[in-house]
Amino acid sequence: MRRGRQRKSKEGREGEEEGRPRKPLDPEKARARTLQRAVKLLAAKPRSVEELRGRLLEKGWADEASVAYALSKLKEYGYLDDERFAFGFASYRVKQKPLGRQRLARDLKTRKVSKETADAALELVYQETPEEELITRAIEKRVRLRGRPATRQETKSLYDHLLRLGFSYDLIIRKVREASDAPEEDEGEA
């Protein structure tokens, strides 16, 4: 069951009866409507400036001028800030799952955050939680679930898994070697 406002049928829309096109909104109403839509989109989830711009323009009912007005108002009110968004997004993702710098940079690029802003946010996030600590957590979790890699195929599988998580090649090689060389703990000892 859908919640929210009921949509009127085509017969009930203003100006559309008898095949006439709808009247365009006056600029003031268009700006207010775009601002209202932007606030709803931000209430659903945090977004970057460009991501929000794209969402507002995608339906075609908002023009560039009213979108620019809405974005400037939201920045003025402090609701829209790419630096804060990038840092919050990156720290949340790292706390949820150990991810490497490359993966987070790619995710922020997908969210349309500028490279400079993303790099600054990643620098702060990885100062709090170093990448070495994250890759160690990722390896420990994988070993807990699948056991220590015994064959070349299992080692490659672990390596590929860490690459997908976005860790650098050199760091993966070093940590996988450390994990392979580490003596296995006896599970039967108490």
Model-predicted segments: where are they?
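An alpha-helical, amphipathic repeat domain used for nucleic-acid recognition
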Residues: M1-A190
